């Protein structure tokens, strides 16, 4: 309640974040209310950041961006998992180097428990871990991975001496330090979850390469991943759609909680269970496994109903039409005629990424 109250009080604001469609076709009133409330709070949060940092300086956590504010929103750490960079910045008017130093150390040594960190408040709730999430993904100025506080502190001091930059937003001076992740940072993150992926793949009969491709496309293996539609975790599961469908299929009532979906193993299990539901239930009428895979991938992003409606408003007729087409024609149709540009691109991205995992 304390964290929610802090967010609710974050006054005035802007709107900015990556779009993400709701996974699944179950849209109920409770989901709409929750989403509208979340949108309002996100708008307030963004507006507060704009007031402090400036119009072009709004940064909010997303599926592939870890953003954490501290020091009354005057300091922030941003990990861009696509670009492979860590940027720590502050607008603190006094002792900016000290603020940066603390944030650098905390970011380098933070654990991989997203449920313990509130990305929408300035509470300094980042716990230093003996198994840092970024261990092996970043090395210090001597080329060594960073596990202990002493090494992180020395590296922070080195960065402040050699890489400190400043710029003006028109109102304040922004001091920053940028650190590059190692070139194979994506593979290092993916490796953390291979065992969980293998277990879920066997449990639900889903190809490991598809699960990994979905994870890379959705979150770039960022366990802290959130979206504007409140999709959570590595596979970007929405509680009130895909999450609820999976719980219902497993004989559970209600919806999975945020802490449940922020747990990597639970998130991967739920996302994979939903892929199996799409494959075996919602799109089970598609005979050709390759055509069905294309449909499942697209449906994971935009829903099974929207996939079938590309071919016909009648679900049975849609499946019959798909069954009369070659897999190549199904792919071409979904990547050119699906009403959502995001879903069209999604199939292209996931299919290409899955091919790369099959070659490994």
UniProtKB/Swiss-Prot annotation:
Catalysed conversion reaction:
Exolytic cleavage of the (1->4)-beta-glycosidic linkage between N-acetylmuramic acid (MurNAc) and N-acetylglucosamine (GlcNAc) residues in peptidoglycan, from either the reducing or the non-reducing ends of the peptidoglycan chains, with concomitant formation of a 1,6-anhydrobond in the MurNAc residue
For the protein in the UniProt heading, the enzyme class is lyase
**Pfam families listed in its UniProt record:** Mltc_N (PF11873), SLT (PF01464)
> Which PROSITE patterns does this chain map to?
PROKAR_LIPOPROTEIN (PS51257), TRANSGLYCOSYLASE (PS00922)
Classification via InterPro entries: Lysozyme-like_dom_sf, Murein_transglycosylaseC, Murein_transglycosylaseC_N, Transglyc_AS, Transglycosylase_SLT_dom_1
Asked if Cell wall biogenesis/degradation is a keyword of the record, the answer is yes
**What organism is this sequence from?**
Citrobacter koseri (strain ATCC BAA-895 / CDC 4225-83 / SGSC4696)
The protein's UniProt keywords, in alphabetical order, are:
Cell outer membrane, Cell wall biogenesis/degradation, Lipoprotein, Lyase, Membrane, Palmitate, Signal
The name this protein carries in UniProt is Membrane-bound lytic murein transglycosylase C
